[in-house]
Regions:
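Flexible glycine-/small-residue-enriched beta->alpha junction loops
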Residues: 82-135
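Active-site-proximal alpha-helical scaffold in enzymes
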Residues: 65-94, 132-162
Length: 179
């Protein structure tokens, strides 16, 4: 498997390498969002990514807002730049859903919340079902939205709209045969 910190570092190296006259020391901070910060994607993954992709002089941090973690990292970076506390921040998210089990390695639910609001601990699939009921979204509506989204993405890729944003990453493949 490719570790999420290695994956993010490869993307960041490509990003900064594609900017003319850019030096890593120009980066004031690295902010990485991650939904399940455990094991290979836990600890201080933001710092590790900075060490792998930028330099020891660039700090790095990890934030968590579950599925919105990467977007929140970008919001935080924009707010800091807008406030004048930074000029250049690399921000985004990284995750490896195959490296960490759902709910993490040790689920530690809050007893009071689990008794008073058990729905707070619904997984994303069940949350989607609840939201579909609440907002009257049918399966057909959801499928149509998904199809349209994929068609737009394919069209944009074919037209080259994301040629500078999509980075090819070569990974080592591992096959396990249980014969």
């Amino acid at each position: 498997f490719t570790r999420p910190d290695d994956l993010a570092a490869k993307v960041i190296k490509h990003l900064v390498g594609s900017i003319k006259n850019f030096e890593n020391k120009m980066v004031d901070d690295l902010i990485v969002g991650n939904a399940v910060p455990e094991a290979e994607q836990g600890m201080q993954m933001g710092r590790y990514i900075s060490l792998l992709a930028l330099s020891k002089e660039v700090p790095g941090m990890i934030i968590n807002r579950y599925c919105g973690s990467g977007l929140e990292a970008i919001h935080l970076a924009c707010a800091r730049i807008h406030a004048g506390t930074a000029n250049c921040i690399v921000a985004g998210g990284t995750e490896s859903m195959s490296m960490v089990p759902m709910m993490g390695y040790k689920s530690a639910l809050n007893y009071t919340i689990s008794k008073e609001h058990p729905d707070y601990y619904l997984n994303m699939g069940l949350t989607a079902e609840e939201l579909a009921k609440e907002y009257s979204i049918t399966r057909e509506m959801s499928d149509e939205f998904s199809l349209n989204s994929h068609q737009k993405a394919i069209h944009a890729i074919k037209k080259g709209f994301f040629k500078d944003e999509i980075v090819s990453i070569e990974v080592e493949e591992t096959y396990i045969n249980k014969e």
